[in-house]
Amino acid sequence: MGLSIRKSAKIVGINIATSFFWRHKILDCISSFLGTGHVDGVIEADEVFFAESFKGTRTANMPRKSRKRGKEIKKRGISKEQICVATALDRQGNLIIEPLCKGRMTHKELESLYKGHIGENSILCTDSHKSYIKFATDFNLDHKRIKTGKHKEGIYHIQHINSLHSNLKKWMGRFNGVASKYISNYMHWFKWLRLFETDRDSVKTKNFIVQSNVTYAYTKIKDFKLRTPQFV
């Protein structure tokens, strides 16, 4: 599941603008229904980056010179032109996936995201990023750091979260670029698909309709123009 706005419009028989507005009103509801989530036990955590995008923004309102779609960011390494999405996955399949900040994350941003959403005394498996050290200490988590170049430390690894990132990037690629202000909705859409991936298509369709109507989105068309990237 996951078609472009144009393909969705053609299938349903509506214009592209209506397809766009319907998609994000529905995804606003799905995001509200899912919430941030909760992880517990053995947890793999990492971050994934997407190039900042102003797709759909008029040239006159652009905060920087536009870049051709798919073109590489000029700055090397992690920069403020990248959106950092924090992810955490436990062995039961529970998932947290939220846009966190622009550029490099800090332990305070991690704490802001995971406070109240991560089980006490859990085992946290991460790469060697320093921000996780202070975060794990403050939250009283047993921290297993997987050193660069290694795949695991005993039974602890981050292979599941790395695989999730690979699938996420492949899935995002089908949309031909997503504006950063909507990336939160796409992360929650991906999360929904993952949580219900073993269900039959008929059950998925029923769940999607029901769950998108459990909550109400007060989003108006004019609000889309004013929306900014939503960070935790």
Regions found by a protein language model. Name each.
Residues M1-V232:
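Residue-level recognition of single "structural anchor" positions
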